[in-house]
């Protein structure tokens, strides 16, 4: 990814000014996500860039359910179209533990069909950083023909991703 392209997470910043620092700084602890939303956006970006090591390392080990780096590398690998964050929050419990949720739609195309992962993701803050734990899937409705395109091009859906 070149510096002149916007980060896939939808922030409207360049990748270098956005998720790259999180992707490169995770192992050293130099740069960690400061909120569930930032972690979720950086994980979406990692899926787009096929940085599956980041996906595994930001997924809480107790919730992997057998998911491996090899499985992620094998695919399937859709063409990611865009991310819509619908809501995000985090709370601190009286005992000091932190939890968060992010509801989003991650639009993709696979085998010529457009669909979305529509999920309410759950996160936990442990060992000084946020981890993804699990997600609750919901059904995503495709936009109408005259609605804005899911890829955030500024075009109508019928003039953009719906065409091809």
Swiss-Prot record:
Top-rank taxon: Bacteria
InterPro entries cross-referenced by the UniProt entry: NTF2-like_dom_sf (IPR032710), SEC_C_motif (IPR004027), UPF0225 (IPR023006), YchJ-like_M (IPR048469)
Family designation: Belongs to the UPF0225 family.
HAMAP family reported in the protein's UniProt record: UPF0225
UniProt-recorded name of the protein: UPF0225 protein Shewmr4_2054
């Amino acid at each position: 990814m070149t510096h002149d392209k916007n980060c896939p997470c939808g922030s409207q910043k360049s990748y270098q000014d956005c998720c790259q620092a999180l992707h490169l700084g995770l192992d050293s602890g130099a740069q960690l996500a400061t909120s569930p939303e930032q972690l979720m956006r950086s994980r979406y970006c990692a899926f787009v860039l096929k940085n599956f090591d980041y996906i595994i390392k930001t997924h809480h080990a107790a919730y992997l359910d057998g998911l491996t780096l090899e499985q992620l590398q094998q695919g399937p690998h859709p063409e990611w179209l865009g991310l819509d964050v619908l809501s995000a929050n985090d709370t601190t419990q009286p005992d000091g533990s932190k939890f968060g949720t992010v509801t989003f739609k991650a639009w993709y195309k696979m085998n010529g069909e457009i669909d979305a992962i529509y999920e309410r993701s759950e996160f936990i803050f442990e060992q000084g950083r946020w981890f993804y734990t699990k997600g609750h899937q919901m059904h995503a409705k495709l936009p109408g023909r005259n609605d804005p395109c899911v890829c955030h091009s500024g075009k109508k859906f019928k003039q953009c991703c719906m065409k091809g």
